[in-house]
Every structure is written in C-alpha cells, then in structure tokens.
Amino acid sequence: MDRLHTSSADWPDHLATQVVRVRGGVLQAAGQSDHVAEETPVALEFNGISHATMLVTPTHLDDFALGFALTEGIVGGMADVRGVELETRCDGIVVQVEIATSCEVRLKERRRAMAGRTGCGLCGVETLPEVVRDVAPVADSDALPVHNVLRAMQSLRSRQTLHDATGATHAAGWADASGEVVLAREDVGRHNALDKLIGALARQGIAPLPGMAVVSSRASFEMVQKTASAGIPILAAVSAPTALAIRLARQTNVTLLGFVRNTDATIYSHPQRIAA
C-alpha cells in the first residue's frame, strides 16, 4: 500500500455531556456529566466511487475501510489496496480508498449506495443472494484448548477501554493460540468493530492461523460471514448466535461458540477445533 493518511486526531471517540441522574427512584441534582460514545457518518469511496455510508465510531477508520473492503469481497488482499486517505466533509468523514483497477468489477457487484444504521450490514442490499453470498471455507486448523478460548474472552474485556468510559460500544479482538488478545478494536456497531479488527490484522500482516476472533456481542450471520472471509477459523461470542449464523458457520468450516462467559461456552459448529 503506497499511501496511507489516516490521522484521526480531530475526531474524538467520546465526549462529556450534561445529564440528570435518577438513583433509587429519586432525581439527583442537575449539573452532572456523563461520557457518551461518538457516532459519525463515514462514507466509503473506492476509486472515487461512493459505495456506502455507515455510522461508525471515528477511530481506526483506515482499519475499518480495509476490513470492509476485504470482508465484502471488494479486494482480494492488501496487494489490491493502493492507498487510504481520510477527509472531513460537512458533518461526516470520507474515507477514500484507492484499489487496483482489476477490482472494479467486484466493486460494482458489491456496490451499495445507502445511509446505514449503526452497524447495519444489510442496508441497501437489494436481493437475498447479495446477502448470503458464497464464501470459501476456512482452512482446517489444529485444536485449541477450551481454557484458551475462555481466557481470550476474559482478555478481551480488559481491552474495552471505550466501553468502560461510555458503556456503549462493542469490541472485537484477535487472540493467539494461547488465548491472549493481542489486537482489539471497538465501535458502536458490532460489524464495524469486526471490520476494524480484520483490517488491522491485514494491515499488520498478522496471519489468521492459528488463533481466534472474540466478540462482545451476539453472533449474527454477517459476523460469521466476515470471519470466514478473513480466513479466521474460530469465532467466539459472549452472546447467542442466530440460526442462519450457525448454518453459515457449518458451511464455511468456522468453529462458532456462543455464550462464552466465565467457565462456560456452547459450541455450535466444528467442535473438532476445541480440545479439553
């Protein structure tokens, strides 16, 4: 990637606002403050073509754009990305991504022109095949001890600094085979957080094997779709998966775990990757 200009110093991830609290059913004195997460319209442009507008926490937007391009099948890898630039316009941010001209056919196939809701991955998709598109199965990988998966979820919690400040964000983390989260991203949208993580993995050249993705949310089918698109073998979620997510995980050779909390978890697909 030849050009990367992604300073986000002008875009805070949260701010303080005046509130009136109720405690024990009693109104408290005015003049108190609380920290709330920022939510900013972010437009993605590929080779000058407007593709999507999402509501995103305005941090790690380079990772977000790269992860989105990868998981949407717009680019096949970092070799297809020529540069990323950020620009403030009106009331939002434009992320301009320059990609190889050979990717423009795929771009047109996946093009979305919409104003998305928070973390909404389906806004603007017109037909069902566009939603449940073909994703290549993930490569087989060695089993990891279940203790390491549980450790990874606990490790993710310690990386949720924005959530600690605001209580409003999801996190997606990448844990190595030992269960240590070595990379994490947060966002108001769970899909956005996972895109940021996948983009960061690609940008930093971190291989998806061995290891796992852990998320502080439920596991929707699109979370599984993004995980499989990135070649990640295991997705562990703190909450429940959907039926479609389970079917897609089984089809794409992704080991899907839900309700990963403390010493418990439920394995919904490909349990051979989880060892005692």
UniProtKB/Swiss-Prot annotation:
This is Sulfur carrier protein FdhD. Its main location: cytoplasm. The keyword Calcium does not apply. GO terms for molecular function: sulfur carrier activity; sulfurtransferase activity. It comes from Bordetella bronchiseptica (strain ATCC BAA-588 / NCTC 13252 / RB50). It comes from the Bacteria. The active site is at C120. Belongs to the FdhD family. Keywords: Cytoplasm, Molybdenum cofactor biosynthesis.
